[in-house]
């Protein structure tokens, strides 16, 4: 039985990691009867094992809830779950475009974090009605009054209006549902107009093909009808329509304002772009919905199968993952040291780790990941501008007019006791101080301009250890700026290992090189000849380590006798070692690559 449009509410939940967003979603599902006893498990909307383990939400989930309000009327609430991590702000923006309201969940003991600010600003950009919720009030360390003041001072929301809740105990859930019904506006749109539906996510089903998640803005959608993707122009026939409750349930119709899913026998990932508009092929809309900005990868790295024969399996796995993850980009590449693999682009470091872990878990692949790098911009002496995603693409130093790297505006929220160590860390990472403001008597918001390359390694880990885990960060891209950058090559026994080349600021080149050559020295097994490991910028060697040769005890049988006899045997051994060094080939073990390329261990 279709519900009138004025009784539909589309909303999402935005929060920083660990502020209780997924637990609150569980309580809303439980309270409205969407989940009963046996099917209830913690973090229902976090369907990936990885999401539950790391306690974060990566993929979007959309659920329809039926709720009878205090006014006695039945309402249809569509909850769109969103990720909270800085890397997934693109997915957050997708879910926001499908909503009219947002629940802003803030931890009563931790207060507003940097990511909360970023997501609230995104929600305000989409003109959403924001309902503030102060969660975890059952904790002994909860300070709801302080958080209310922060909501007013930092975001400009009415703190007295905030709902006090404990998602763990289920306190305040009814009040939240009533506020959604009262404050979130019903969806607009005209059911009689030509169909326009926004694709805000998709997943791949081996039997039904691509299943797209839709929010209908105008018109109506029926099974069996032909639809057209407005960006690609491809046409398909709808085979199935449905909604998530959270289990999928088929329906005979979706109307303007509703959220649901569609299967239409779409076999190719590229045919249904997230952010595209679906329209009726017989009566198409005149213009598509304003599209999303396309997610721009910020961090690149190489993914290579340990076993070269698995290259096609990796390609197939990436194809499937990219279907569920619109922000993953990849292209084939070859490496003399690692063979065939892919150069992949990610939103950030967590995104990269999660993709790698999903490839290994869900597809059973063994992978080597090269050091992450950002996209550098090189202007050649002839005026040509190149985007460098891989150190091996960098032209010779003599042909480079200037090099630029991406800079970001980093916002750091931390307790005032840790200002010193954090500023020292930022200074060490070539940060330029911009601003510092107190958002409460104990908490400070510091902003720095920093090169993205300095953040993608282990900045977040260092920040957490410098502040005992109390700091949170967020960053926004500022654009490209000129920097003194060099390419450092690693040579083992005179052979360049392209997989270990890095682009780094001239001032940090020696420090980084020293760590890499020392680590290789410890990991490459000794041979019968001496192995020299070098780090070089062009022709100039800046760091060097040697692995001493294994020596056979040639003097063992030479008891007593003349010293010249012993010397002769040693000279003969030395000659053999020299000859071996010229023709010998060093096999570098997998662990050596893995260790040098391991992220965040500088």
UniProtKB/Swiss-Prot annotation:
GO terms for cellular component: plasma membrane. It catalyses: GTP + H2O = GDP + phosphate + H(+). It is a peripheral membrane protein. The keyword Chaperone does not apply. It is found in: Cell membrane. Its main location: membrane. SUPFAM superfamilies: EF-G C-terminal domain-like (SSF54980), P-loop containing nucleoside triphosphate hydrolases (SSF52540), Translation proteins (SSF50447). It comes from the Bacteria. GO terms for molecular function: GTP binding; GTPase activity; ribosome binding; translation elongation factor activity. One of its GO terms (biological process) is positive regulation of translation. It holds the Pfam family LepA_C. Gene3D superfamilies: 3.30.70.240, Elongation factor 4, C-terminal domain (3.30.70.2570), Elongation Factor G (Translational Gtpase), domain 3 (3.30.70.870), P-loop containing nucleotide triphosphate hydrolases (3.40.50.300), Translation factors (2.40.30.10). This is Elongation factor 4. The lineage of its organism: Bacteria, Bacillati, Bacillota, Clostridia, Thermoanaerobacterales. The gene is lepA.
């Amino acid at each position: 039985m279709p519900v009138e449009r004025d009784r539909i509410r589309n909303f999402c939940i935005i929060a920083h990691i660990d502020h209780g967003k997924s637990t609150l979603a569980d309580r809303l599902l439980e309270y409205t009867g969407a989940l009963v006893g046996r099917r209830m498990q913690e973090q229902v909307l976090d369907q990936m094992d990885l999401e539950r383990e790391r306690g974060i939400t990566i993929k979007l989930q959309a659920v329809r809830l039926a709720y009878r309000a205090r006014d006695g009327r039945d309402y249809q609430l569509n909850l769109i779950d969103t990720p909270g991590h800085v890397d997934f702000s693109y997915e957050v923006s997708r879910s926001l475009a499908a909503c009219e309201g947002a629940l802003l969940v803030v931890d009563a003991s931790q207060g507003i974090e940097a990511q909360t600010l970023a997501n609230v600003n995104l929600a305000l950009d989409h003109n959403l009605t924001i309902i503030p919720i102060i969660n975890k009030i059952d904790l002994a360390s909860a300070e709801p009054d302080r958080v209310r003041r922060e909501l007013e001072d930092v975001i400009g929301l009415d703190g007295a209006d905030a709902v006090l809740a404990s998602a763990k105990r289920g306190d305040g859930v009814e009040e939240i549902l009533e506020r959604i019904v009262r404050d979130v506006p019903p969806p607009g749109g005209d059911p009689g107009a030509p169909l326009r539906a926004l694709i805000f996510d998709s997943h791949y089903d081996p039997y039904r093909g691509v299943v797209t998640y839709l929010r209908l803005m105008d018109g109506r959608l029926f099974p069996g009808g032909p639809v057209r993707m407005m960006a690609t122009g491809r046409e398909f026939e709808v085979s199935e329509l449905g909604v998530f409750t959270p289990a999928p349930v088929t329906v005979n119709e979706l109307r303007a304002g509703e959220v649901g899913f569609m299967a239409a026998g779409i076999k190719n990932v590229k045919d249904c772009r997230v952010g595209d508009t679906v329209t009726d092929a017989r009566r198409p809309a005149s213009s598509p919905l304003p599209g999303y900005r396309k997610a721009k990868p910020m961090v690149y790295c190489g993914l290579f199968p340990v076993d070269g024969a698995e290259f096609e399996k990796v390609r197939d796995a990436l194809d499937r993952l990219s279907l569920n993850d619109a922000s993953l980009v990849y292209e084939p590449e070859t490496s003399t040291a690692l063979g065939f693999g892919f150069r992949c682009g990610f939103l950030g470091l967590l995104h990269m780790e999660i993709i790698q872990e999903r490839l290994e878990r869900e597809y059973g692949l063994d992978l080597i990941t090269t050091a992450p790098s950002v996209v550098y911009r090189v202007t050649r002496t002839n005026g040509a501008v190149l985007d460098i995603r891989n150190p091996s693409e960098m032209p010779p130093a003599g042909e480079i007019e200037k090099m630029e790297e991406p800079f970001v505006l980093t916002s750091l929220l931390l307790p005032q006791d840790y200002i010193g160590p954090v500023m020292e860390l930022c200074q060490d990472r070539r940060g330029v101080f911009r601003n510092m403001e107190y958002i409460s008597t104990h908490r400070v918001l510091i902003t720095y301009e920093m090169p993205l390359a300095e953040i993608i390694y282990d900045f977040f880990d260092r920040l957490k250890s410098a502040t005992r885990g109390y700091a949170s960060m967020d960053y926004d891209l500022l654009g490209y700026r000129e920097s003194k950058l060099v390419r450092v090559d690693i040579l083992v026994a005179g052979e360049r290992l392209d997989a270990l080349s890095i682009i780094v600021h001239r001032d940090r080149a020696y420090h980084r090189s020293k760590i890499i050559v020392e680590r290789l020295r410890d990991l490459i097994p000794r041979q019968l000849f001496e192995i020299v490991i070098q780090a070089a910028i062009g022709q100039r060697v800046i760091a060097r380590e040697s692995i001493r040769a294994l020596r056979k005890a040639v003097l063992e049988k030479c008891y007593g006798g003349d010293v010249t006899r012993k010397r002769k045997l040693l000279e003969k051994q030395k000659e053999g070692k020299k000859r071996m060094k010229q023709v010998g080939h060093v096999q570098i073990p997998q662990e050596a690559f893995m260790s040098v390329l391991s992220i965040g261990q500088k």
